[in-house]
Amino acid sequence: MKEIKAILRPNRLSVLRERLMLLPNFPGMTVSKAEGCSARSVLQGSARPKDDLADYVPKVRIEIVAPDDTADEIMDVIIKVGQTGQVGDGLVWMTDIGRAAFLYKTTSLGAGRSDMLNKPSAKDMPL
């Protein structure tokens, strides 16, 4: 399993969603509002602290947990859609996940964890 995270320009989100939904095994995504600044704006700096608080640019943060066999394809779509060639386009990265599970069912997403299916459900466990 892989976790793919991306910080993108908000105006790229609708196109990205359309393209990702075309992938046959797209697992879904979580989207959050974010703010950020590029390294260039940090290095240029500001003489007034008030300016430092106002120079953040609106972004969206996307998080996707995907099987190993689809993660590279998802990341490629994010790169193609998000890249405009301008400073501030954003960032995308991928990390390994040892184990994940859907909360609405007892299906484990992590490799080697099929034993989850034989364990008692959460409703059978005391709180």
Residue ranges and their predicted role:
Residues 1-127:
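Positively charged, small/polar-rich N-terminal and surface patches that mediate targeting and assembly
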